[in-house]
Amino acid sequence: NTMAPTAKGTIIDNELIPHVIKSIAAKDDITAVKIVSSRMLLATGFLRKVFEIFETFNTSIDMVTTSEVGVSLSIDNKMHLTQIVEELKKYGTVVVEENMCIICVVGDLRWMNVGCESCITAALHDIPIRMISFGGSDHNISFLVREVDKKEALQALSYHLFSPKCDGSKAFEKSKSCKRSCLKSKL
Protein backbone atom coordinates (compact mmCIF):
# COMPACT_ATOMS: atom_id res chain seq x y z
CA ASN A 1 0.00 0.00 0.00
CA THR A 2 1.81 3.12 -1.18
CA MET A 3 -0.48 5.27 0.96
CA ALA A 4 0.65 3.45 4.13
CA PRO A 5 4.11 1.96 3.44
CA THR A 6 4.77 1.25 7.13
CA ALA A 7 1.44 -0.48 7.72
CA LYS A 8 1.40 -4.07 8.94
CA GLY A 9 1.57 -6.51 6.05
CA THR A 10 2.94 -3.94 3.60
CA ILE A 11 6.32 -4.54 1.99
CA ILE A 12 7.64 -2.05 -0.53
CA ASP A 13 11.09 -2.55 -2.03
CA ASN A 14 12.85 -2.41 -5.37
CA GLU A 15 14.17 -5.97 -5.36
CA LEU A 16 13.34 -7.86 -8.54
CA ILE A 17 11.87 -11.26 -7.76
CA PRO A 18 11.65 -13.44 -10.88
CA HIS A 19 8.14 -14.35 -12.11
CA VAL A 20 6.43 -12.24 -9.45
CA ILE A 21 3.87 -9.46 -9.71
CA LYS A 22 4.73 -6.88 -7.04
CA SER A 23 2.06 -4.19 -7.13
CA ILE A 24 -0.93 -2.59 -8.78
CA ALA A 25 -1.30 1.19 -9.08
CA ALA A 26 -3.91 3.53 -10.52
CA LYS A 27 -3.90 7.11 -11.79
CA ASP A 28 -7.18 9.02 -12.15
CA ASP A 29 -8.34 11.99 -14.21
CA ILE A 30 -6.82 10.76 -17.46
CA THR A 31 -8.01 11.87 -20.90
CA ALA A 32 -7.75 9.60 -23.94
CA VAL A 33 -7.16 11.16 -27.35
CA LYS A 34 -7.53 9.11 -30.53
CA ILE A 35 -6.50 10.38 -33.96
CA VAL A 36 -7.59 8.37 -37.00
CA SER A 37 -6.23 9.33 -40.40
CA SER A 38 -5.96 7.40 -43.65
CA ARG A 39 -3.13 9.82 -44.44
CA MET A 40 -1.14 8.11 -41.68
CA LEU A 41 -0.90 4.89 -43.70
CA LEU A 42 2.71 4.63 -44.89
CA ALA A 43 3.28 8.30 -44.02
CA THR A 44 6.68 9.31 -42.74
CA GLY A 45 6.71 11.78 -39.86
CA PHE A 46 3.06 11.50 -38.84
CA LEU A 47 3.82 10.59 -35.23
CA ARG A 48 6.44 13.32 -35.00
CA LYS A 49 3.82 15.88 -36.07
CA VAL A 50 1.35 14.57 -33.48
CA PHE A 51 3.94 14.62 -30.69
CA GLU A 52 5.08 18.13 -31.67
CA ILE A 53 1.54 19.40 -31.07
CA PHE A 54 1.63 18.09 -27.51
CA GLU A 55 5.11 19.52 -27.04
CA THR A 56 3.97 22.93 -28.29
CA PHE A 57 1.32 22.97 -25.56
CA ASN A 58 3.68 21.55 -22.91
CA THR A 59 1.45 18.50 -22.40
CA SER A 60 3.08 15.19 -21.50
CA ILE A 61 1.78 11.92 -22.92
CA ASP A 62 1.33 9.02 -20.47
CA MET A 63 0.51 6.12 -22.78
CA VAL A 64 0.56 5.67 -26.55
CA THR A 65 -0.52 2.93 -28.96
CA THR A 66 -0.48 3.02 -32.74
CA SER A 67 -2.00 1.20 -35.69
CA GLU A 68 -1.71 1.60 -39.45
CA VAL A 69 -4.12 4.53 -39.57
CA GLY A 70 -4.39 5.79 -36.03
CA VAL A 71 -2.76 6.69 -32.78
CA SER A 72 -4.30 6.63 -29.30
CA LEU A 73 -2.70 8.32 -26.34
CA SER A 74 -3.48 9.49 -22.85
CA ILE A 75 -2.74 12.71 -21.01
CA ASP A 76 -3.28 13.90 -17.44
CA ASN A 77 -3.26 17.64 -18.18
CA LYS A 78 -6.34 19.07 -19.92
CA MET A 79 -5.24 22.71 -19.70
CA HIS A 80 -4.71 23.04 -23.47
CA LEU A 81 -6.95 20.19 -24.64
CA THR A 82 -9.16 22.40 -26.83
CA GLN A 83 -6.17 23.85 -28.69
CA ILE A 84 -4.51 20.44 -29.00
CA VAL A 85 -7.67 18.91 -30.51
CA GLU A 86 -7.99 21.79 -33.00
CA GLU A 87 -4.40 21.23 -34.16
CA LEU A 88 -4.85 17.44 -34.36
CA LYS A 89 -7.97 17.84 -36.53
CA LYS A 90 -5.67 19.02 -39.33
CA TYR A 91 -4.42 15.42 -39.57
CA GLY A 92 -7.59 13.38 -39.10
CA THR A 93 -10.63 12.59 -37.00
CA VAL A 94 -10.12 13.20 -33.28
CA VAL A 95 -12.05 11.49 -30.49
CA VAL A 96 -11.61 12.55 -26.86
CA GLU A 97 -12.67 10.47 -23.86
CA GLU A 98 -12.43 11.96 -20.39
CA ASN A 99 -12.82 10.41 -16.93
CA MET A 100 -10.39 7.62 -17.68
CA CYS A 101 -7.96 5.85 -15.38
CA ILE A 102 -4.57 4.20 -15.94
CA ILE A 103 -4.09 0.94 -14.08
CA CYS A 104 -0.54 -0.34 -13.95
CA VAL A 105 0.60 -3.82 -12.90
CA VAL A 106 4.24 -3.89 -11.79
CA GLY A 107 6.57 -6.87 -11.52
CA ASP A 108 8.84 -9.15 -13.50
CA LEU A 109 7.14 -8.89 -16.88
CA ARG A 110 10.06 -9.77 -19.12
CA TRP A 111 8.79 -11.14 -22.44
CA MET A 112 10.31 -14.57 -21.76
CA ASN A 113 7.97 -14.99 -18.76
CA VAL A 114 5.34 -16.53 -21.00
CA GLY A 115 1.77 -16.21 -19.80
CA CYS A 116 2.21 -13.39 -17.32
CA GLU A 117 0.58 -10.72 -19.48
CA SER A 118 -2.25 -13.04 -20.50
CA CYS A 119 -2.91 -13.83 -16.84
CA ILE A 120 -3.15 -10.13 -16.05
CA THR A 121 -5.37 -9.42 -19.05
CA ALA A 122 -7.60 -12.41 -18.29
CA ALA A 123 -8.25 -11.04 -14.81
CA LEU A 124 -9.85 -8.03 -16.53
CA HIS A 125 -12.14 -10.12 -18.73
CA ASP A 126 -15.27 -8.23 -17.55
CA ILE A 127 -13.74 -4.75 -17.79
CA PRO A 128 -13.88 -2.68 -21.01
CA ILE A 129 -10.25 -1.83 -21.78
CA ARG A 130 -9.65 1.30 -23.87
CA MET A 131 -5.89 0.94 -24.33
CA ILE A 132 -3.01 -1.36 -23.37
CA SER A 133 0.64 -0.34 -23.16
CA PHE A 134 3.27 -3.06 -22.79
CA GLY A 135 6.80 -3.53 -23.99
CA GLY A 136 8.30 -0.15 -23.20
CA SER A 137 9.47 -1.61 -19.91
CA ASP A 138 10.09 -5.10 -18.58
CA HIS A 139 8.44 -4.09 -15.34
CA ASN A 140 4.91 -2.91 -16.06
CA ILE A 141 1.84 -3.28 -18.18
CA SER A 142 -0.67 -0.44 -18.22
CA PHE A 143 -4.37 -0.43 -19.04
CA LEU A 144 -6.61 2.54 -19.73
CA VAL A 145 -10.13 2.01 -18.38
CA ARG A 146 -13.04 4.24 -17.46
CA GLU A 147 -12.86 5.66 -13.95
CA VAL A 148 -16.23 4.03 -13.21
CA ASP A 149 -14.58 0.63 -13.84
CA LYS A 150 -11.49 1.34 -11.72
CA LYS A 151 -12.68 -0.25 -8.47
CA GLU A 152 -13.86 -3.43 -10.18
CA ALA A 153 -10.61 -3.66 -12.19
CA LEU A 154 -8.42 -3.21 -9.12
CA GLN A 155 -10.43 -5.78 -7.18
CA ALA A 156 -10.24 -8.30 -10.02
CA LEU A 157 -6.48 -7.85 -10.42
CA SER A 158 -5.90 -8.00 -6.68
CA TYR A 159 -7.95 -11.17 -6.35
CA HIS A 160 -6.43 -12.96 -9.33
CA LEU A 161 -2.85 -11.91 -8.65
CA PHE A 162 -2.55 -11.75 -4.85
CA SER A 163 -5.46 -13.43 -3.06
CA PRO A 164 -4.71 -16.63 -1.12
CA LYS A 165 -8.09 -17.82 -2.41
CA CYS A 166 -6.85 -17.60 -5.99
CA ASP A 167 -5.68 -20.92 -7.36
CA GLY A 168 -5.27 -19.49 -10.83
CA SER A 169 -8.54 -21.00 -11.98
CA LYS A 170 -10.99 -18.10 -12.05
CA ALA A 171 -10.79 -16.27 -15.37
CA PHE A 172 -8.12 -18.45 -16.90
CA GLU A 173 -8.56 -22.09 -15.83
CA LYS A 174 -7.14 -23.52 -19.07
CA SER A 175 -3.83 -21.66 -18.96
CA LYS A 176 -1.10 -23.50 -17.07
CA SER A 177 1.17 -20.46 -17.27
CA CYS A 178 -1.54 -18.29 -15.68
CA LYS A 179 -1.93 -20.72 -12.82
CA ARG A 180 1.83 -20.75 -12.36
CA SER A 181 2.09 -16.94 -12.50
CA CYS A 182 -0.78 -16.44 -10.08
CA LEU A 183 0.64 -18.89 -7.57
CA LYS A 184 4.15 -17.43 -7.80
CA SER A 185 2.76 -13.94 -7.25
CA LYS A 186 1.74 -14.95 -3.74
CA LEU A 187 5.36 -15.42 -2.58
Predicted regions and their residues:
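C-terminal catalytic "cap/lid" subdomain
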Residues: N1-G136, N140-L187
